[in-house]
Each structure stands twice: as structure tokens, then as C-alpha cells.
Amino acid sequence: MIGACGWQHPRWLEEFYPEDLPAEWQLGYYGNEYRVVLIPAEYWQDVDLSVETWLEETDNSPLFLSEWPQDRVAGERARAGMHELGARGLGFVISLTQMPAEAEIGIYKELAGGHALVFDIGELSAQAQESALGLLTQALGENRFGICWHGEPQGQAHLALGPLALTRISAVKDHKELRRIIQTILEQSNHHRKMVLIVDGDPPDIQLLQNAGIMLDLL
């Protein structure tokens, strides 16, 4: 599945959404084009956010992944929202900038009871990444979580981990690099796992999204 990080992007009014499309229809329009979306952590800061409205605005697409907010109140809102999304909620993406504390591990254990978890450890040093993998495996269990891949050749083994494999990119050098990334994802695909490619950016590059979709169809 291919999608973007977020759908509320003002610049998409020129690049993706029709200019006269009401803001409340943007998610439905997006869902007609892409099967999955990553909810940015900051969306959960909005006290007026309504998951019920998201479901009313869309049919069966998109499915939802969510970044895990660091703020406690936003985190509780995200947890409740993912529960409300039901079968359309795929799980949480948790970014680690340092080794998680015992309290954080406790939260991850609770989340893992009902949701797929993918950890982004790209900001950690190589040594810290190995330590984090060991700690998470001890806490959550072998192959019970995924590790986000960013398209770099040396990290592709992470795609084999967990029930949900996530790749996040914001740009590629050329079509050859995009083909390599998508082929690598497909090589790890099977009927028992969900494979997701998310395009990041401010806003995410619509041309890259479209090219990725075309490339996936060709492969």
C-alpha cells in the first residue's frame, strides 16, 4: 500500500486537490486515490478532531497508520482514536530519539496488545539501534514489532520484522532508486504481512506518490 504522511496540506490545493474542494471533503478525495495514510502526531493535538467524522467522510479507504504523540494527552486521544477506527486502524509508528525508559516500555506493551507497532530508530547511533532492538525484543517478543526503513541499502533487513513493514521516504534520486526501493519491499511481502510505503514531506511530493503507484503496478 502506498500513501502520504497527512492529508491536510495547504499546498496540495494547487498540486492535488481541486481548488474548490471543501476542506472537510479532502480526506474522502484522498481516500479515492490512495489506500493508506499516516496520521501525523500533531493532528492529535486538535481538541476538535473527530475520528467519527473521518469515517463518515470516507468509505473503506484509506486505512490509517498513526505516529505516536509524545504528549500524554495527545497520546490518550490517539489511543482512543485508533480504537474507534477499528479494522481501518493499522497501528502506531513510534519514533525513538533515545533509549526508551521503563515507563515508555510499559506504554508500548499496552499498545502492542491491540495494535501493530513500528519503531523508527533512524536517529539513534548504530550501537544504540542494536541496544534498542534487544530491549524491544525482550519487552515485546521476537518479531512482534516492525522497524521503519528509509530506503537506505544497509537497513533493508528491517523490512522482514513484524506483522507490518513500513518504509518512509521523502525523495529519490531517480526512477532507478524508486524501483530498487519498491522491489525490495515486494521481496519481503507475503499474505500474512502488510507492506506500507509512506511519502513524507511538507507537503509530500505528489509526483513521487504517483510515480510510486505506477512503478508498483508495473512490478
Residue ranges and their predicted role:
Residues 1-219:
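Residues lining hydrophobic/aromatic ligand-binding pockets adjacent to catalytic sites
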